[in-house]
Swiss-Prot record:
The lineage of its organism: Viruses, Varidnaviria, Bamfordvirae, Nucleocytoviricota, Pokkesviricetes. One of its GO terms (cellular component) is extracellular space. CDD domains: serpin_poxvirus (cd19585). The keyword NADP does not apply. Belongs to the serpin family. Poxviruses subfamily. The keyword Glycoprotein does not apply. SUPFAM superfamilies: Serpins (SSF56574). Keywords: Protease inhibitor, Serine protease inhibitor. GO terms for molecular function: serine-type endopeptidase inhibitor activity. Gene3D superfamilies: Alpha-1-antitrypsin, domain 1 (2.30.39.10), Antithrombin, subunit I, domain 2 (3.30.497.10). This is Uncharacterized serpin-like protein FPV044. PROSITE patterns: SERPIN (PS00284).
Length: 358
């Protein structure tokens, strides 16, 4: 049977590996990744793939061996759905209408209730992308090269905080050593877990969402050099380590001031899969016998992730009241990493970077 520990290992691997590869491609951009979303995509591709394509997915992403045991697969889906229970997500598997689709795969998709199977031409795909607010460039790329198959996965998360954030004027944020911007800030205060982790040269603060269902871990360094060190050394082992677990943090009254941000990123993660060595599903001679008797390949694999930072609509009236609450003040004014975890299982739901909050 699938278990939470096994799934957590895979989610931590996806978090750090995709973060690393996307950062290499766009080092100066904000990033947000939803590992459960990527795991659901890979499970869908595993179900569709055969032979070498399947083995590439299993070997390089260390995914769960799928689905000779339907109960095992169902349990995995159940856990992933629970992790995403407070998010909004839409998954579409588009296949060109000239390709036949096995009834058995249609039944699998219907039973899993995770993705929608859409058959049509490029106009149908573009309409779906438009409904999901994809950018013009990605829509044009689909028109220039009509796809045999595309996957669209959109996920959004926004929630209230256990300790409300309030507006906190505007302050300098040092995007780089040579670029400074003045951006709106928000502030909160409460009994939060916090620590300094020498292994990654980073401060860590745990800020719970309402009802403590999820928490956001903030990883931030005091210098650019140490932030680069953090990016290089934040591994699956670190994300899963009990050293940074909430039970091992110091709890005291602190105030935390951070840039007010809402982050949305859109990636065609096909290039990330290819860099990981997963190439067969994108090859023109790819055979997805579980889906169709006809040959077709995945042309594009779009993932759009969004995390909204809600400040509970409270306006800060007097800055001094926050200064009186605590002598421990954290003012984050350089790039930082955030990780949103599902507290019941300790699973990573989102991992991202704020490079430029503007």
């Amino acid at each position: 049977m699938s278990n939470v520990s096994s799934i957590n290992n895979k989610l931590a691997f996806i978090s750090t590996k995709f973060y690393e590869l996307i950062t290499k491609r766009i080092p100066d951009k904000n990033i947000v990744i939803s590992p459960p979303s990527i795991m659901l995509i890979v499970k869908m591709l595993l179900k569709a793939s055969t032979d070498r394509s399947r083995n590439q997915l299993l070997d390089l992403l260390y995914m769960l061996p799928l689905d000779d045991d339907e109960d095992d697969d169902s349990n995995t889906d159940k856990i992933l759905k629970e992790l995403l229970s407070r998010t909004e997500y839409t998954s579409i598997f588009f296949i060109d209408h000239n390709k036949r689709i096995h009834d058995s795969y249609k039944k699998y998709v219907s039973k899993s209730n995770i993705t929608s199977l859409v058959s049509g031409d490029v106009t149908v795909l573009c309409n779906k992308m438009s409904e999901l607010n994809y950018n013009t460039e990605d829509m044009l790329s689909s028109i220039r090269k009509p796809p045999e198959a595309s996957i669209l996965f959109n996920i959004k998360y926004s929630d209230l905080w256990e300790s409300p954030f309030s507006d906190n004027d505007s302050h300098k944020f040092f995007v780089t050593k040579y670029l400074t911007k003045v951006v709106p800030y928000i502030i909160t205060s409460g009994m939060f877990g916090h620590m300094y982790c020498h292994e990654i040269k980073s401060n860590i603060i745990n800020i719970p969402y309402l009802h403590n269902t999820y928490s956001m871990l903030l990883f931030f360094a005091d210098t650019y050099k140490n932030f680069k060190y953090l990016e290089k050394h934040i591994t699956p082992r670190i994300l899963l380590s009990s050293k940074i677990g909430v039970s091992n943090m110091k709890y005291s009254e602190i105030s935390v001031s951070i840039p007010k941000f809402s982050i949305q990123t859109q990636h065609n993660i096909k290039s990330v899969f290819v860099e990981l060595g997963i190439t067969d599903i994108f090859d023109e001679n790819c055979s997805m016998k579980s889906v169709s008797p006809d040959k077709f390949s995945i042309t594009s694999l779009f993932v759009k992730s969004q995390v909204d930072f809600i400040n509970n609509k409270i306006v800060l009236g007097d800055q001094k009241k926050w200064e009186k609450i605590s002598n421990n003040n954290y003012h984050i004014n350089r790039p930082f990493i955030f990780v949103i975890k599902y507290n019941k299982t300790g699973s990573v739901v989102f991992m991202g970077k704020i490079k430029d909050p503007e």
